[in-house]
């Protein structure tokens, strides 16, 4: 069973941590500001 090998567990943890940090960075830098801009423009359009 590969789950009992310590290197397998460390490998899984490291890859999960790296993928999570990359996803969080991508969301905060690229994806979420677009949604914020869309919502702000909707608010301004509705106030007209």
Swiss-Prot record:
Membrane topology listed for this record: Single-pass membrane protein
Keyword entries, A-Z: ATP synthesis, CF(0), Hydrogen ion transport, Ion transport, Membrane, Mitochondrion, Transmembrane, Transmembrane helix, Transport
GO molecular function, one term: proton-transporting ATP synthase activity, rotational mechanism
Subcellular location: Mitochondrion membrane
UniProt key word Iron: no
Pfam families: Fun_ATP-synt_8
Role played: Mitochondrial membrane ATP synthase (F(1)F(0) ATP synthase or Complex V) produces ATP from ADP in the presence of a proton gradient across the membrane which is generated by electron transport complexes of the respiratory chain. F-type ATPases consist of two structural domains, F(1) - containing the extramembraneous catalytic core and F(0) - containing the membrane proton channel, linked together by a central stalk and a peripheral stalk. During catalysis, ATP synthesis in the catalytic domain of F(1) is coupled via a rotary mechanism of the central stalk subunits to proton translocation.
Xref: PANTHER family: ATP SYNTHASE PROTEIN 8
Family of this protein: Belongs to the ATPase protein 8 family.
Subunit note: F-type ATPases have 2 components, CF(1) - the catalytic core - and CF(0) - the membrane proton channel.
Name the UniProt record assigns to this protein: ATP synthase protein 8
Gene: atp8
